[in-house]
């Protein structure tokens, strides 16, 4: 080994613990330890792997010139990074090739981009080249600090399913000390008892969904390394060398400079856009101005658009990206190695850039409860730089020293979207691949009908007689509501709209609709009374449709003065993040998608999440919220959550926005708490909400529908907006607005107005009793104990990281139906730590405080004691069959008989 080879601070530790050392990029690094590459790969995928990556280069960039400099020398948009975020990026040359790929981390805690501090991490083998390249281009950028911090700042990575739990054990303040549970987030934290400060980032180079990189002072890094292993070794965590790091990144389809980036086998530049994973790392935001390689990369981008849109391309010789990097699964026996030729139809179409045999754990089950078994397998995979015209499914051959290996182009080898595990992806006809379905024999319709009815009856009896339903978004309607919902209007149409020429009279486009006209008028009056408002729209058939109509209506309203131009979207929206319990329908991935603008700075949907308290992530941080409101000036604020245990700060936010020049629309989506609207919970219009939407079937007594309510009457500020929203409902959203359930909703509204005081008081009291009882039973209840853990119908308990689905399944087997729920610190629903429960349905079936105390005892025995109690729960449920808070059974019975006589 050369004398000038460099060593990380952990070099001696590696040697003392069985590290097989090799020279890599000028560094003396472990390629593997005693367990070997295969075991290190498997341990990372099932448990966690610990990597020394201090050999990588770390450059500090700060000062007023930092952003202009980074915008010029990197492909991504540095301005898109808010503090505590990171992004994958590349250092491009003028020809559209990569000098290197890199990661950029924003370290500061401020909001001003001019005060930002960045850390740029580059590949070890390219560090000196990158340093020289970047220094050559820093001239002309004033007030710029550009320093090499590689020696003083160490870097290690902890990757794999157990990584989160291990860090929680060594960090102060437990899970709240970790970064937010989304990719590319970072946070400064401290080792418990050691006073060692470290920056933790949710990034990595393995494809693991649970991934962390840690930046620590070099003189403290061994202490952190050993602390992690001391906690994790007994659970399967191992140190991992460069060998398994390479097989892990290859299985994840990630590029390696010198293989998938840089120069190809002929010495030509590999276009940056040839590698799929690099495309999101290139930004053409106008905020970047002119930057290195912009024109060349724009040409690559335009050609890729033509290809993906299946539009005519230039002749092959004139194409900028004639070859691309594709994942190829080897279907025959053998291993594809770097440099092997790839053939199709006898002709060479490219070569293998990376290839090996990788091990994998087998997942015998499917779905949310699937976990890796003890059985393992191996598969040969490769990344190949081959003809751009190929698509997934194409068959190719790889020349293994004169022997043809069969392969197939695939989309990917690995899936990381279901934390905590990364799962191997197979295709049919390959080893381990999914099996095709079996053809079904023909069955008589009468037999199918009998089977269907049998299953429906069985399920109805089980759900209505034997199970305790604690799903917070469900509620069984009364018999009268159910039967009215299937009367004749269920089969009819009654389209109508208000016509000004007829004095705002509702004009119906069908005959035979007088009942529906009467029903809608009565329903509107009942709901106006319930909400204490002037306007209601009842034709929406779900809460999501209600939200869509409001978003669409607001966008139309914002464009009302100039309808000749392309309509602009809502500039900015403030809402609850989905991972913090926000409604799916209020997200850019939900109903908001087509109506919110893209922020030109972040290049993401222009949505600002409510900040939450560190000590209570279920509670909005009102101090930070006010700062963000004045910083961003949103045009719409959406309150309301699907995981809602507190009152929403309607009045407080109304106060905050009252002095703004351009006031945002304050929208409260009460989906879960619509049936609690009143003095025991919240009265949104009295507190300052502009508009309320909701579902009528969660805490409200109705069948499954939606509603929109407001005080936007004629003569008010938002009169025009309300008219537009009504038009966005019809004809914008519905034609047939499900008339049967509309009839049922009127009956439910009668019940709600008659019994709301008692019901709302009892639901909230029962929820508090249930929460305290669960706590007394030794279960971990989320929420503020000073508020009784909840102010709504919902109760949330934490059952262990990733254990929510399994515990929910165990409870279902014991006739208790709950909803597994990701906690605010969970990465996804697949890693859910919590159970979300609601007491509203069982309260309506007559359960009281003492009954919820008993239920808490049963749940303790099932969750903690792992006892089987299905029969006991079934007997317990049979005490609560008769529905309350509705017309008494004696009065309802003759009405039910009359309805049964006509619907038979």
How should these model regions be labeled?
Residues 1-34, 433-522, 885-904:
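N-terminal glycine-rich, Lys/His-bearing helix-loop that initiates the first secondary-structure elements
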Residues 436-439, 525, 561, 765, ...:
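PLP-dependent enzyme catalytic core of the Aspartate aminotransferase-like
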Residues 314, 320, 749, 756, ...:
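Conserved small-domain helix->loop->beta segment predominantly found in fold-type I
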Residues 1-89, 97:
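Acidic, proline/glycine-enriched N-terminal capping motif
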Residues 143-149, 234-247, 405-409, 495-499, ...:
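Flexible, glycine/charged-enriched surface loops at secondary-structure junctions
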């Amino acid at each position: 080994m050369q004398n000038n080879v460099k060593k990380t601070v952990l070099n001696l530790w590696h040697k003392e613990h069985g590290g097989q050392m090799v020279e890599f990029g000028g560094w003396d690094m472990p390629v593997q330890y005693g367990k070997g590459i295969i075991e290190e790969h498997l341990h990372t995928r099932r448990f966690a792997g610990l990597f020394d990556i201090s050999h990588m280069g770390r450059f500090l960039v700060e000062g007023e010139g930092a952003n202009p400099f980074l915008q010029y020398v990197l492909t991504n948009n540095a301005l898109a990074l808010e503090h505590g975020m990171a992004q994958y990026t590349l250092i491009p040359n003028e020809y559209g090739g990569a000098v290197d790929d890199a990661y950029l981390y924003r370290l500061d805690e401020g909001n001003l981009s001019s005060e930002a501090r960045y850390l740029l991490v580059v590949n070890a083998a390219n560090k000196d080249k990158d340093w020289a390249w970047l220094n050559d281009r820093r001239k002309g950028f004033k007030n710029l600090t550009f320093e090499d911090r590689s020696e003083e700042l160490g870097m290690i990575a902890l990757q794999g399913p157990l990584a989160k739990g291990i860090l929680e054990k060594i960090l102060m303040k437990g899970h709240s000390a970790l970064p937010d549970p989304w990719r590319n987030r970072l946070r400064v934290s401290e080792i418990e008892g050691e006073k060692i400060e470290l920056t933790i980032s949710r990034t990595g180079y393995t494809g693991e969904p649970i991934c962390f990189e840690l930046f620590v002072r070099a003189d403290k890094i061994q202490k952190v390394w050993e602390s992690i292993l001391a906690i994790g070794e007994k659970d399967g965590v191992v140190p991992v060398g460069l060998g398994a790091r390479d097989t892990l990144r290859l299985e994840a389809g990630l590029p390696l400079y010198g293989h998938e980036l840089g120069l190809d086998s002929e010495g030509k530049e590999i276009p940056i856009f040839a590698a799929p994973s690099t495309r999101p790392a290139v930004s053409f935001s106008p905020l970047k101005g002119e930057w290195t390689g912009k024109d060349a990369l724009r040409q690559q981008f335009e050609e890729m658009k033509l290809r993906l849109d299946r539009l005519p391309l230039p002749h092959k010789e004139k194409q900028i990206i004639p070859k691309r990097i594709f994942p190829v699964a080897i279907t025959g026996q053998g291993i594809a190695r770097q440099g092997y030729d790839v053939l199709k139809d006898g002709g060479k179409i490219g070569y293998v850039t990376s290839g090996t045999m990788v091990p994998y754990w087998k997942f015998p089950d499917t779905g949310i409860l699937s976990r890796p078994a003890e059985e393992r397998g191996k598969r040969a995979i490769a990344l190949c730089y081959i003809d751009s015209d190929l698509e997934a499914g194409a068959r190719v051959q790889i020349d293994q020293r004169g022997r043809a290996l069969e392969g197939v182009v695939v989309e990917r080898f690995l899936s990381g979207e279901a934390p905590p595990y990364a799962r191997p992806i197979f295709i049919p006809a390959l080893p381990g691949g999914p099996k095709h379905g079996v053809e079904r024999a023909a069955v008589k319709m009468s037999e199918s009908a009998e089977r269907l009815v049998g299953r429906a009856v069985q399920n109805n009896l089980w759900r209505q007689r034997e199970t305790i339903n604690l799903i917070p978004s469900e509620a069984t309607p009364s018999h009268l509501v159910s039967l009215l919902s299937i009367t004749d209007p269920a089969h009819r149409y009654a389209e109508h709209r208000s016509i000004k020429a007829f004095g705002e009279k509702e004009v119906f486009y069908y005959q035979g609709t007088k009942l529906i006209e009467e029903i809608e008028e009565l329903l509107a009056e009942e709901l106006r009374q319930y909400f204490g408002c002037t306007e209601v729209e009842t034709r929406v058939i779900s809460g999501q449709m209600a939200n869509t109509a409001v978003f669409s209506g607001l966008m139309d309203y914002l464009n009302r003065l100039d309808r000749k131009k392309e309509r602009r979207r809502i500039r900015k929206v403030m809402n609850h993040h989905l991972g913090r319990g926000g409604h799916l329908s209020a997200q850019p991935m939900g109903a908001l998608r087509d109506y919110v603008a893209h922020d030109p700075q972040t290049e993401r949907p222009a949505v600002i999440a409510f900040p939450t308290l560190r000590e209570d992530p279920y509670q909005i941080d009102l101090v930070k919220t006010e700062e963000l409101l004045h910083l961003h000036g949103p045009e719409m604020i959406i309150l309301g959550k699907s995981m809602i245990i507190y009152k929403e700060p309607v009045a407080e936010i109304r106060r905050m926005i009252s002095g703004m020049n351009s006031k945002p629309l304050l929208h409260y989506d009460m989906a879960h708490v619509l049936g609690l609207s009143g003095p025991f919970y919240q009265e949104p219009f009295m507190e300052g909400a502009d508009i309320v939407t909701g579902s009528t079937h969660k805490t409200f007594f109705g069948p499954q529908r939606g509603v929109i309510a407001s005080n936007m009457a004629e003569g008010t500020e938002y009169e025009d907006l309300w008219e537009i929203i009504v038009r966005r409902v019809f004809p914008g959203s519905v034609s047939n607005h499900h008339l049967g359930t509309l009839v049922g909703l009127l009956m439910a509204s009668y019940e709600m107005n008659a019994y709301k005081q008692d019901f709302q008081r009892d639901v909230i009291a029962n929820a508090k009793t249930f929460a305290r009882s669960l706590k007394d039973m030794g279960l971990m209840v989320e929420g503020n104990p000073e508020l009784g853990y909840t102010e709504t119908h919902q109760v949330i308990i934490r059952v262990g990281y990733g254990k929510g689905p399994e515990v929910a399944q165990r409870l279902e087997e014991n006739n208790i139906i709950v909803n597994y729920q990701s906690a605010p610190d969970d990465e996804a629903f697949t890693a859910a730590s919590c159970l979300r429960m609601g007491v509203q349905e069982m309260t309506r079936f007559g359960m009281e405080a003492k009954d919820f105390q008993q239920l808490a005892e049963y749940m303790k025995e099932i969750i903690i004691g792992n006892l089987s109690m299905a029969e006991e729960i079934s007997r317990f449920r049979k005490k609560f069959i008769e529905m309350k808070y509705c017309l008494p059974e004696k009065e309802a019975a003759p009405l039910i008989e009359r309805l049964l006589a006509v619907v038979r």
